[in-house]
Amino acid sequence: MAPFVRNLVEKTPALVNAAVTYLKPRLAAFWYYTTVELVPPTPAEIPRAIQSLKKIVSSAQTGSFKQLTVKEALLNGLVATEVSTWFYVREITGKRGIIG
């Protein structure tokens, strides 16, 4: 056991340096996208969101969603799946459990 621990202690600085070197550009990109994408909407963006929601409701009422191409329908389905998945993940996180 002692040789294992000694070997691990000797290699730890090299492993940490490798991890920092590997993660530094990725964390910079991650931080950039979190500051850009996770900001709350500005007051100027709210009317566009309402207009988009009205357009979705209108297409559901008139049946114009049937004229979508397969690619557009697939992309819309993937976006809806992603939104609902993140909603449920956040609900589970907020409740601190799956049940209850």
UniProtKB/Swiss-Prot annotation:
Q: One Pfam match, by short name?
A: ATP-synt_G
Decide whether keyword RNA-binding is in the record. Answer: no
Q: Keyword annotations for this protein?
A: ATP synthesis, CF(0), Hydrogen ion transport, Ion transport, Membrane, Mitochondrion, Transport
- Offer a single GO CC term for the protein: mitochondrion
**Could you name the domain of life of the organism this protein comes from?**
Eukaryota
Its annotated compartments are: Mitochondrion membrane
GO MF terms listed in the record are: proton transmembrane transporter activity
Question: Tell me, what is an example of a GO biological process annotation in this record?
Answer: proton motive force-driven ATP synthesis
What protein family does this chain belong to? Belongs to the ATPase g subunit family.
Summary of the function given for this chain in its UniProt record: Mitochondrial membrane ATP synthase (F(1)F(0) ATP synthase or Complex V) produces ATP from ADP in the presence of a proton gradient across the membrane which is generated by electron transport complexes of the respiratory chain. F-type ATPases consist of two structural domains, F(1) - containing the extramembraneous catalytic core, and F(0) - containing the membrane proton channel, linked together by a central stalk and a peripheral stalk. During catalysis, ATP synthesis in the catalytic domain of F(1) is coupled via a rotary mechanism of the central stalk subunits to proton translocation.
Describe, as the record does, how this protein assembles with itself and its partners.
F-type ATPases have 2 components, CF(1) - the catalytic core - and CF(0) - the membrane proton channel. CF(0) seems to have nine subunits: a, b, c, d, e, f, g, F6 and 8 (or A6L).
Q: What is this protein called?
A: ATP synthase subunit g 2, mitochondrial
User: What organism does the record attribute this protein to?
Assistant: Homo sapiens (Human)
Q: Which gene encodes it?
A: ATP5MGL
